[in-house]
Amino acid sequence: MGQGESIPSRQIQRDASMQAVSSESENINDSDRQNSGFSRLWNRFPSLQRVLGLRRAKRHRNDEGNSENGNRDRTTERSAFRSRYRGSLLNRNSPSLRSLSPPATPATPRSRIEGESQTSAIPQTDRLILENHQQEFERAARRFRSSIAALRNLNTQNNQSTLASNHEDENVSSSGGQEMQDHGSVNNLESPGTAIGRLPVRSVTSLADSNMEDYTRAVMNYINNSENTQQASVSPEESQLVMLSRFVFSVASGWVSVLMNSSSAHQSNNLEFPSSISGNVESGNVAFDEFLSLLHAGNLVQAMNAETNPRTAELIANAVDLEEESGPINLFRTFRFDNLHRNHEGQEVIPIIIVGIRSLRNSGSDEDDQPSADSPTLMHPSDLISSLVNSQNQTTSVSDNTGPNENVNEAEHISEDEQASTATDVNGISDNNGSSTQQAPETRNNNSQTDHQLPRSWAIYVREAFVPQNHPVLRAPSLFTDSPTYEDMLLLNSIIGIEKPPVASQKDLEKAGGVFPFSGTDERCLVCLSNFELNDECRRLKQCNHFFHRECIDQWLTSSQNSCPLCRTKGVASASTPSSPKP
């Protein structure tokens, strides 16, 4: 017992030591588990430092040279990275025209190494895109330069051909002598103060080889060439007249295009000069192309043949000064195109164009809204023809010694019953709507002008129609000359005058019936606005069952129009149109 410990005590010590070892191992495991998360985080921290540039290599006493080389390498890498980044940003944007265009002055020479480095810095795809854009720009520039050169060559050829044709026409006119002048040779056209050139002489035989399109193209080419010539500046007094002339030119040329497009014969038939009924171009009558050229040049007086009447020329001169004392001005021209015809319902029709200008004076009183003889509301061509007829009647009755050229284009009195109306058809043949245009007046800034001197307005009439060969207008030869006669003007006024609605005859009223004595109360006639009295004789219209005084409705149906004054239905059956009773 004394030599050693007992067996139970040894077992207890062994168990205690084993328990201590196990507890220590558990503590170590717990500490390892706690430090594992920190270790992983700490292991990641150097990589984060390298990304942020916070960690640097450890320096040693013997590594001074190595550190300088490393810094130099890092600086080179950073500069290369920056250059590549900037190049990518520049290549992302589309190149501008200025960047693609060659430099105006040679750039400063650069070293080969620097150029190669910048070229290598641009990606291959971006370099190809840049080269493609530059090639496209160069091709577009070449096409633009070639088109400009072609336009210049075309303009030069047109000018040379115009000069050659003018030279040939001068030779023909000089060799023809007096005979060519009798057949309507064209003289030099002069604007106020300077010449605008010579229109190519085109007789009836020379126009036999050209159609309507060539004829119109020749006229427009001549007008375009005349624009390039130097013209004298228009004085302020003539500005309104020149503007009016060019406005008439635009309206007339537009209706020529309408006439050409509406005719189906211009593709196969030839075009002749607008001439008189005899086929010869008389002295004083100008061709339509010369008429347009004179209007475009501002020669309204010469284009409308107003210079043949000194009184009308004086009125136009006064109208330019916008004087109230000058009388009304009426200018009138008619043209026909014999070969530009077409078939209409089995009948050949010939186109004609009527151009008219009428001056209108504005009233300065408070009654401007009231219609007057010179009111701008007179917008129908018959107003112009009526004034011309009245003017001619007065001129011919003054003296028997009056010349044939002094009996038109002058009107001192205008009837008060002239009213506006729409354009009507000529003899039932297809007629396009005429053009009626007003030019706004222009006032002068002059303090010396009194209140009664007001500006003028101008009404422009352009009428285009297709008439048959046996139409009375074509059988009036003076209408296509500079001296239309009084009878022909009356004929034209009756043809294009205001169309009245159809009226009933006395026989139609007798057959209509519907007469009865009135037996009601508290009603009145809507024609005379009088109350009906007992046993008043009334007439009831069968179409609408409206009734009126017999005398009132009979006068309305026979003088005004054959329709009900209340509902506008047909009044009584006429001899040509049978009635259809209302169900």
Swiss-Prot record:
A zinc finger (RING-type) spans 525-568. The keyword Metal-binding applies. Keywords: Membrane, Metal-binding, Phosphoprotein, Zinc, Zinc-finger. The modification Phosphoserine is found at residue 580. It is found in: Membrane. CDD domains: RING-H2_EL5-like (cd16461). Residues 1-38, 156-165, 172-191, 384-408, 420-452 have a biased composition (Polar residues). Residues 70-80 have a biased composition (Basic and acidic residues). Coiled coil: none annotated. It comes from the Eukaryota. Pfam families: zf-RING_2 (PF13639). SMART domains: RING (SM00184). Residues 88-102 have a biased composition (Low complexity). InterPro entries: Znf_RING, Znf_RING/FYVE/PHD. Residues 1-39, 53-124, 156-197, 362-452 are annotated as: Disordered. One of its GO terms (molecular function) is zinc ion binding. One of its GO terms (cellular component) is cytoplasm. One of its GO terms (biological process) is ubiquitin-dependent protein catabolic process. PANTHER family: RING-H2 FINGER PROTEIN ATL51-RELATED (PTHR45676), RING-H2 FINGER PROTEIN ATL66 (PTHR45676:SF41). This is Uncharacterized RING finger protein P4H10.07. It comes from Schizosaccharomyces pombe (strain 972 / ATCC 24843) (Fission yeast).
